[in-house]
Amino acid sequence: MNIRIYQIDMDKDTKSVKFENLEDTLNIAGQVNPAIYSQVYANVCDCNNLEDVFFKFNVEKPIDFTGHSLSVSDVVEILDGENKGAYFCDSLGFKKIDFDTSAACA
């Protein structure tokens, strides 16, 4: 599975939405703002679904992963396959969202 992971940069998080669930993020900020996110991983990983990604990036972190353990408010972008798109790590599972990756910091 070819993925990218984005995490909120605390220096850009003026509305304090890091680690907030999707509903609270939308209530506080009105959107999931890609401009406050930084890309912390981009590679092919040995995962079949988002639950595998969550496990891997909490228990078996790859050496090229520069972020914290995968948490609520992080965004996982799947770059290939039928589930291609951006997914918000929510309190329970993942939710597909609109996320302009070109606005996030690489």
Over which residues does each language-model region extend?
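Short intrinsically disordered terminal tails
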Residues: M1, S102-A106
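Extended boundary segments
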Residues: M1-C45
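Aromatic side chains
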Residues: Y6, Y37, F57, Y87-F88, ...
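Context-gated lysine
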Residues: K12-K18, K56, K61, K84, ...
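Short, low-complexity, polar/charged sequence segments that are solvent-exposed and flexible
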Residues: L22-N27, I97-D98, A106
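Short, conserved turn/kink motifs that form compact alpha/beta structural patches or helix kinks used as
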Residues: G30-D80
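Generic recognition of cysteine residues
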Residues: C45-C47, C89, C105
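Short, compact, well-ordered microdomains
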Residues: T66-A103
